[in-house]
């Protein structure tokens, strides 16, 4: 068969043969096979052209995708899959991109961890979860995480939380909230305990008593609809104690209002 026409169509070229076959190819494909109008090609050559064109097109797509930010193997695979490329072609593209160091899951993890150390507040468990969602192997993640000291990150996150909640919660409630928030961010309980033990959490006593009075007033309005006398006092005490207020402060206030 003969190539009847090669016509540029935006980023691709339309190749038509005199037997009715047609396909889109990249410029790299034309150069690789030295294709030209009137050139004789066999069915086997046409199949090779199709395979190379898919590979070249897919690789260009992948490089475009990677140009915006670093990507993992899985991210590139999923992106190419959306463009209806064959699995065998996608695997070849990824293998070549790995060989050329365009894709490197190890470096991706290291970059992710560096960014978290500089600007982030995530603990190892949350980081592991996020990286596994990106298709990175557990072995790569565990090795990289084991080399990071997460104490400074947890401490920085803790100080930020203290600054945010210090004037809104009593000391015990602040400590409890701090513990829960840090665990939710993926830090281990032992590390959170160590951070809490080394931080000096100071709360203004006058402010704490003001918060206690406001909370007591709120709880009293609610509980007085169902309880009275000793039962009301007990329920109110329990409600305030659960909120993290000091038992002596609660008893003192209850003596004034009940």
UniProtKB/Swiss-Prot annotation:
Keyword Cytoplasm in record: yes
Gene3D superfamilies: Winged helix-like DNA-binding domain superfamily/Winged helix DNA-binding domain (1.10.10.10)
Keyword Cytoplasm carried by entry: yes
A Pfam match: RecX_HTH1
Subcellular location: Cytoplasm
Domain of life per record: Bacteria
Keywords associated with the record: Cytoplasm
InterPro entries assigned to the protein according to its UniProt record, in alphabetical order: RecX_HTH_1st (IPR053926), RecX_HTH_2nd (IPR053924), RecX_HTH_3rd (IPR053925), Regulatory_RecX (IPR003783), WH-like_DNA-bd_sf (IPR036388)
Protein function: Modulates RecA activity.
Family membership noted in the UniProt record: Belongs to the RecX family.
Protein name: Regulatory protein RecX
Organism: Streptococcus uberis (strain ATCC BAA-854 / 0140J)
